[in-house]
Swiss-Prot record:
The lineage of its organism: Bacteria, Bacillati, Actinomycetota, Actinomycetes, Mycobacteriales. Cell wall formation. Synthesis of cross-linked peptidoglycan from the lipid intermediates. The enzyme has a penicillin-insensitive transglycosylase N-terminal domain (formation of linear glycan strands) and a penicillin-sensitive transpeptidase C-terminal domain (cross-linking of the peptide subunits). Has little peptidoglycan hydrolytic activity; however it inhibits the synergistic peptidoglycan hydrolysis of RipA plus RpfB. Pathway: Cell wall biogenesis; peptidoglycan biosynthesis. Residues 1-120, 792-820 are annotated as: Disordered. This is Penicillin-binding protein 1A. Interacts with RipA via its transpeptidase domain (residues 561-820). The active site is at E213, S487. The chain crosses the membrane at residues 139-159. It comes from Mycobacterium tuberculosis (strain ATCC 25618 / H37Rv). A penicillin-binding domain is found between residues 420-820. Residues 792-804 have a biased composition (Low complexity). Its EC number is 2.4.99.28, 3.4.16.4. InterPro entries: Beta-lactam/transpept-like, Glyco_trans_51, Glycosyltr_51/Transpeptidase, Lysozyme-like_dom_sf, PBP_transglycosylase, PCN-bd_Tpept.
Length: 820
């Protein structure tokens, strides 16, 4: 204890005295991190006015206070201070010095002899620091006023506003047939959109949108200050986030910023929207903004942009919209789904009237014209939605076109969904209709599980002219399925034989044979004895072609190689290696000649097209031309090199064609109409170990069209029979569909002939049948006789010998059963 009777802290030596009532005590140092405790004394006075102040001081960790002054000095300083101002001695950096211990009665500065008066705590009043209050107010004003201005200016200078046309919205790509008719639309996930130029939008439609959304559009700076302030309030305290945005702000929100949200993130989005809209107004013309806005805004029914909305609500081009129709579309922008006339006719009518009144207010419509307007009729929503959905076989064409664009033409999905592509395909509407009608006709009344696939390809360039994989736009595509081909694969054994110098006149036995314990027979015991390989192909003799395959160098692998050369894919989805016994690229087994391995319908059409083109292979393709929304040609097949690849020697291909020419007529009279030349081959596969069938084929071509037809069942797990229960062979329903498709597709075109084959293996084409054996003339001896009694004759005179002409040829034998 010192001379003044005050204790000192042992750890710091800072003075510590009793608390003066009404005064804030000295803040002790923060000793929470030390184990040294101050000494305990009898002095119970606290250094702070109350326990709360003590805790706050301890947490603040304030430095120790300097020693207090003498009480006499305190009084003297208080008396000398100006009125209303605390003595300077009580101000240390904005803090009062701590008072000393209370003095004796009368030592507080009161005149002697007076009774003690209630003490006024002048030092506490002196704690209010007006200088710091003023500084705080200035800082607050700077934050509230100057900071947003500086931030806005910096953001304005930094933000980069794209040029008109740089912002690519997701647009609908259109798929067209070769004649320009529409096949399908590739609709982006968020809906239907087709961009148009502002010049295509009638003036009254533009004025209706302005009247509905931003009546000062052409005069405002791109933003509404009152609307922005209202949006800020609603972001912070809840409420409608629309905020009375201008057309420019709405466009920025939809194209660049995104939809607003409540809270701080929503406020930041709104601020960004304001900056970009302001700068855009200085760099874009108002017409550019309006055009971009009309192409991006949502109108309901899955329609984005004024062009798609015109189709969705009125089924007409935007150029044909009337004043009343344009006003209704403008009325929908605020609440497109709920204001649809099909949902809320009264609300739609009220908003429509409001838009028309706005057009009068903005001088876009005269009062008389306004009075003449009638609320327009709209198409049903279901019809509008159906317009955006591809139906029937076209959906499978769309699928193939999309795949081809993505895989083959370096047109990625983003480009496909944003550039509003116009894709012209190779599909010939006449051929497509013929294929669809043929399938519908011949499958009508059959088993509901029966399915068919048809693909027609132009041999000159590989263009797919008709494509039918099923009638469900979103269903399974049987034209892309792996299916067993049966005897239609024998053609590739013939290709391999001719490539090895075995001509069409080569004779082969047709009797049954057994190889490795497997007995090979012909359907219904057919045979030709021994005949040439062209005749064996016409009759589809399994035994003859099995023997031919065994004779080939390479055997079954030679058949596989010939098939791949012609155009049979080496792999496709679901089959990593085609024509391979182990499925890993290993060699095939002998059953390849009978069509045991899986092949797609489109590949059979393509491979036969190679034969039709005298051995020149053209990859099958759907895409003829691709043009972007702004008219840029991205791809044009007519300018590409399409000379093809001579995969098979011309002489070989032409001899194969010659061997196949009689088959269509031989297969139950399926010659093409008008005597048109064709080359074809049927095929049938067996259903397991039964005598029933599972798949049936007819594949054939003319010089200008190759068509493959498959008929089977959904899962291939049941016998393929007609409605009457009869087994279906390739010469039956598939040949019917093939003939109808070819006749319909080629109707109106000139008949063509195949090239005359040159010699291969000593034969140029199919050798003529051997002449019948010569029959020597017969002689007849006539002996004159005379009857001498009833029933009794005797010769008279010498006999006479007469030479007779050869007998006339025997009538033709019965026609053999056509090949399956």
């Amino acid at each position: 204890m010192n001379s003044d009777g005050r204790h000192h802290q042992s750890s710091s030596g800072a003075p510590r005295g009793p608390a003066n009532p009404g005064q804030r005590g000295q803040v002790p140092p923060d000793d929470r991190l030390t184990a040294i405790l101050p000494p305990v004394t009898d002095d119970r006075s606290a250094p702070h006015a109350d326990s709360i102040e003590a805790v706050k001081a301890a947490l603040d960790g304030a430095p120790p206070m300097p020693p207090p002054r003498d009480p006499l000095e305190e009084v003297t300083a208080a008396l000398a201070a100006p009125p209303g101002k605390p003595p300077r001695g009580d101000q240390l950096g904005g803090r009062r010095r701590p008072p000393g211990p209370p003095g004796p009665p009368g030592s507080s500065g009161q005149p002697a002899g007076r009774l003690p008066q209630p003490r006024v705590d002048l030092p506490r009043v002196g704690q209010i620091n007006w200088k710091w209050i003023r500084r705080s107010l200035y800082l607050t004003a700077a934050v509230v006023i100057l900071l947003p201005m500086v931030t806005f200016t910096m953001a304005y200078l930094i933000v980069d506003v794209p040029k008109p046309g740089d912002i690519r919205t997701n647009q609908v790509s259109t798929i067209l047939a070769s004649d320009g008719s529409e096949i399908a639309k590739i609709v982006p996930p968020e809906g239907n959109r087709v961009d148009v130029n502002l010049s295509q939008v009638p003036m009254h439609v533009r004025q209706a949108v302005i009247a509905a959304e931003d009546r000062n559009f052409y005069s405002n700076p791109g933003f509404s200050f009152t609307g922005f302030a209202r949006a800020v309030k609603n972001n912070l305290f809840g409420g409608d986030l629309q905020g009375g945005s201008t057309i420019t702000q709405q466009y920025v929100k939809n194209a660049l910023v995104g939809s607003a949200q409540h809270g701080w993130s929503g406020l930041m989005r709104k601020a960004k929207e304001l900056v970009i809209a302001t700068k855009m107004s200085g760099e874009w013309s108002k017409d550019d903004v309006l055009q971009a806005y009309l192409n991006i805004i949502y109108f309901g029914r899955g329609a984005y942009g004024i062009s798609a909305a015109s189709k969705a609500y009125f089924d007409k081009p935007v150029e044909q919209l009337t004043v009343a129709e344009g006003a209704l579309l403008a009325a929908l922008i605020r609440r497109p789904s709920t204001l649809d006339p099909a949902v809320d006719p009264e609300g739609a009518h009220a908003r429509w009237n409001w838009v028309l009144d706005g057009m009068v207010e903005t001088k876009a419509l005269s009062p008389n014209d306004r009075a003449a307007q009638v609320f327009p009729e709209t198409v049903p929503p279901d019809l509008a939605r159906a317009e955006n959905q591809t139906k029937g076989p076209n959906g499978l064409i769309e699928r193939q076109v999309t795949r081809e664009l993505l895989e083959l033409f370096n047109i990625d999905e983003q480009t496909l969904n944003t550039q509003g592509l116009v894709v012209t395909t190779t599909i010939d509407p006449q051929a497509q209709r013929a294929a669809e009608k043929a399938v519908a006709k011949y499958l009508d009344g059959q088993d509901p599980d029966m399915r068919a696939a048809v693909v027609s390809i132009d041999p000159h360039n590989g263009a797919v002219r008709a494509y039918y994989g099923g009638d469900n736009a979103n269903g399974f595509d049987f034209a892309q399925a792996g299916l067993q081909t049966g005897s239609s694969f024998k053609v590739f054994a013939l290709v391999a034989a001719l490539e090895q110098g075995i001509g069409l006149g080569y004779q082969v036995d047709s009797s049954p044979l057994t190889v490795d314990g497997i007995k090979i027979t012909n359907v219904e015991g057919e045979g030709c004895g021994t005949c040439n390989i062209a005749e064996a192909l016409k009759m589809s003799l399994n035994t003859s072609y099995y023997r031919l395959m065994l004779k080939l160098n390479g055997g079954p692998q030679a058949v596989a190689d010939a098939a791949h050369q012609a155009g049979i894919a080496s792999s496709f989805p679901g089959v990593a290696h085609t024509l391979s016994e182990d499925g890993k690229g290993g060699p095939p087994n002998n059953g390849i000649v009978l069509g045991q391995y899986q092949t797609r319908v489109i590949d059979m059409a393509s491979a036969y097209a190679t034969l039709a083109a005298s051995g020149i292979y053209h990859p099958p393709h759907f895409v003829q031309k691709v043009v972007s929304a702004n008219g840029q040609v991205l791809f044009d097949a007519s300018t590409a090199d399409n000379t093809g690849d001579q995969r098979i020697p011309k002489a070989v291909a032409d001899n194969v064609t010659a061997a196949m020419e009689p088959i269509a007529g031989y297969s139950r009279g399926h010659n093409l109409a008008g005597g048109r030349d064709s080359a074809a081959k049927t095929g049938t596969t067996q259903f397991g170990d039964t005598t029933a069938n599972k798949d049936a084929w007819m594949v054939g071509y003319t010089p200008s069209l190759s068509t493959a037809v498959w008929v089977g069942t959904v899962k291939g797990d049941e016998p393929l029979v007609t409605a009457s229960g009869a087994a279906i062979y390739g010469s039956g329903l598939p040949s019917d569909i093939w003939k109808a498709t070819m006749d319909g597709a080629l109707k109106g075109t000139s008949n063509e002939t195949f090239p005359k084959p040159t010699e291969v293996g000593g034969y140029a084409g199919v050798p003529p049948p051997p002449p019948p054996p010569e029959v020597p003339p017969s002689e007849t001896v006539i002996q004159p006789t005379v009857e001498i009694a009833p029933g009794i004759t005797i010769p008279i005179g010498p006999p006479t010998t007469i030479t007779l002409a050869p007998p006339p040829p025997a009538p033709p034998a019965a026609t053999p059963t056509p090949p399956p």
